[in-house]
Amino acid sequence: MKKRLPTLLASLIGSALYSQQALADLADQCLLGVPAYTKPLVSGDANSLPVHIQADKAAANYPEHALFSGNVYIEQGNSTLTADEVQLTQRQEQNNAPLRTATATGNVNYSSNEIKLQGPKAWSNLNTKDTDVYQGNYQIVGRQGRGDADTMKQRGDNRYTVLENGSFTSCLPGDDSWSVVGSEVIHDREEQVAEIWNARFKIGKVPVFYSPYLQIPVGDKRRSGFLIPNAKYGSNNGFEFSAPYYLNLAPNYDATIMPNYMSKRGTQIQTEFRYHTTPGEGLVEFDWLPKDRVYSSEHASDGDSDRWLLYWRHNGVMDQVWRFNVDYTKVSDSNYFDDLDSKYGSTTDGYATQKFSFGYADENWDTALSYKQFQVFDTNSSDAYRTAPQLDVTYYKNDVGPFDFKVFSQAAKFTNVNNSYPEATRLHIEPTLNLPLANRWGSLNTEAKLMATHYQQENIDEYNENTGTGRHLKGSVNRVLPQFKTDGKMVFERDMDYAPDYTQTLEPRLQYLYVPYRNQNDIGVYDSTILQTDYSGLFRDRTYSGLDRISSANQLAGGVTTRIYDDQRAERFNASVGQIYYFSRPRTGDITGTWDNYDNTGSVVWAGDSYWRISNQWGIRGGLQYDSRLNSVALGDAVLEYRRDENRILQLNYHYASPQYIEQMLSDISHTGYQQGISQVGVTGSWQLVDRWSLVGAYYYDTKANQPADQLVGLQYNTCCWAINVGYERKITGWNSTDSSSQYDNKVSFNIELRGLSSNYGLGTDKMLASGILPYQRAF
């Protein structure tokens, strides 16, 4: 580990020296004391630009010697030099151009659009622009960074800056909280790298670290090196310390390797590889924790205590028509995200997606060949289906007379992780004819389609005998369903009488949908789940996702939306309310279906959404769904948020799901924590108390279970050259199977950051809010 410390420190200091992004994010107060170049920039060859000299006195012996004294001011291009005295000399050298030099003494100040130098004496070769400043100090223009040196040298036509016994800190003048010093520092602007010999890192005036040699990245070029380390303590993992190392492998790909030490479990190695190539861009992450001591003791029967995660995301487009996408996550065991932190999954995830797709699209065709399966984390679930593979082909032809024509077709092969479950091959074709009519105040779309599906089901005998679902699957099934739909919308607009320059709209919508009934009890459920019915869902064609369940429909969906726009055409308010009126009850014939056992007709489902931007700081958003079949409010949510600025946020929210709704939607979930419904109130926020202190917190309480779901509090102290934050989080990670009680993880985090060492000069509260099990989401 000691061998790695020089590289760690080098990368931290290098980021502070020349982080352009950090400059863009600097708080205004951090620019106090930082010099700024306010004059117009002068372009062109500096050697060809005129030199302007002012002085109280001048004496010359042309062309060998000239002496300027008293308030000497010299300007050339973007550079100026002031001193008590400046002596110019010119000496003819054999077979060479005359050597011209300048020596400045007394209160020497050199400034340009890049740097300011001060010292008692300076020397410059006017031919080569080589310059030396003695016993001086420097300050970077326009960003934090300053220091001093016995000698400061400019070499190689300003390519190299050499400091002898030099120092650097990003702290403002008068604050020397930290600094790095070296016997020699060479900064190469072209290669954007700096080398430091005999480097000492100081906290105040006390040296705390020494390295004989450091090489640090500077400028915008990516350089390999350690990033900012992190430390925290939790009841699940014990003390944790991570030190990410960045690898700049090539201009189009790089990697980050992060050893993450956990005192209770061991050392995890997290490797993230990023690439950008002609076939596309993507990211691959592989995390490896060998011999997890906690997992080994809690799951001794498993035998294998190695924990790992593999994640691959790829998005690629070639020749504007070919596309290849990957969304793949796989972990070693179902408890991985409960035990270990990862940005690619959380404790609330019930499964991990593993999908590959390859497609082609042009003006009339859209095709995709995909493979998809799920790694389900519920140990009681053993019926997860995979599509291996699935082919989707869609043909579009618009403006066929007054009609738009489309044909969607699909071929899919379904297999199950459980060998005792059925497998199926599904073929589907769906031609659609649409008549769109529209003008500036309304639209009417009338659509007719035919849905024809063939199933070839295998391995069904054991399922029919033992499943207990009441379904009786058949080997070969054909299902043909026509569908008719007409959807009308209108938009009325008026100027508001009591609010000048404000505009209100009224947008009624009416949709009739008809699908005849077909008994589908002989078809397995391979990729269909019931869909949530919010306001926009009232006008959905389908009650179920996928193709295995297509519910009958003889219904009229109606709704109305009103919006209010201010004088800048920004939406300040909207409210929507609607319902579905069933002329006959929707059915699929599946006796285990969610809604087949209800015979309600009439106004069955109501839904509403609303949003009110009360002011630039206050906003309200909410939604409500009522289902008469359950005789209760099915779902509800409300959010009230005050946002003064990015560092001052306060949000109050509430989420509700009735027990009846949970029972219908998640009938296979047996845990009592779900069966009693969801009623959860939460408050979250971050607040900059004063310029240097900020507080962040979140608290979510489940009123059904009478217990907190997530608790988070953090405090950060921030200055222009260093920051510190301390955080505490207590979150649910699972349930105790013996007594159904909740299991919690208590975690304390502690971070110190040298300001200027990262690209973010904000207070960091957004990251803390996003780290909770229930991350903060903006209301407006």
From Swiss-Prot:
Compartments where located: Cell outer membrane
InterPro entries registered for this protein in UniProt: LipoPS_assembly_LptD, LptD, LptD_C, OstA-like_N
Residues in the signal sequence: 1-24
Superkingdom assignment: Bacteria
Gene Ontology cellular component terms for the protein in this record: cell outer membrane; transporter complex
Gene3D superfamilies assigned to the protein according to its UniProt record, in alphabetical order: Lipopolysaccharide (LPS) transport protein A like domain
Keywords: Cell outer membrane, Membrane, Signal
Pfam family, one: LptD_N
Major site of localization recorded for this protein: membrane
Biological process terms in GO annotation: Gram-negative-bacterium-type cell outer membrane assembly; lipopolysaccharide transport
Similarity remark: Belongs to the LptD family.
Function comment: Together with LptE, is involved in the assembly of lipopolysaccharide (LPS) at the surface of the outer membrane.
Oligomeric form and interacting partners: Component of the lipopolysaccharide transport and assembly complex. Interacts with LptE and LptA.
Stored HAMAP family: LPS_assembly_LptD
Protein name (database record): LPS-assembly protein LptD
Lineage: Bacteria, Pseudomonadati, Pseudomonadota, Gammaproteobacteria, Enterobacterales
Gene encoding the protein: lptD
